[in-house]
Amino acid sequence: MKLSFLSLALATIFVMAIIYAPQMEARASSDADADAAASADADADALAEASALFKEILEKIKAKLGKK
């Protein structure tokens, strides 16, 4: 197969794949409560992680100073 026919065949396959691909549509979530809950969960997770990290650092400092 010549190179020109190969590129034509690939272009045809590409166009057919685009034409017959399933149509997808993105929809925005309109539920404000779900967005607020997700934000609150993310904030709580971040706060818990920061608190655990702070406690770990504090324990290491106490261990270095010899306090229990």
Curated annotation (Swiss-Prot):
Signal peptide feature range: 1-17
Write the record's keywords in alphabetical order, separated by commas: Amidation, Secreted, Signal
Tissues expressing this chain? Expressed by the venom gland.
Tree of life domain: Eukaryota
Which residues are part of the propeptide segment? Answer: 18-52
Q: Does the keyword Secreted apply?
A: yes
Q: Name one Pfam family in it.
A: Pilosulin
The compartments listed are: Secreted
Positions carrying Leucine amide are L65
Coiled-coil region:
none
Keyword Cytoplasm in annotation: no
Q: What is its main location?
A: secreted
Query: What Gene Ontology terms describe where this protein resides (cellular component)?
Result: extracellular region
What role does this protein play? Unknown. Does not show antimicrobial activity when tested on S.aureus and S.xylosus. Does not show hemolytic activity.
Family from the record: Belongs to the formicidae venom precursor-01 superfamily.
Please state what the protein is called. U-myrmicitoxin(01)-Tb2a
Give the species this sequence originates from. Answer: Tetramorium bicarinatum
Supply the source organism's classification: Eukaryota, Metazoa, Ecdysozoa, Arthropoda, Hexapoda
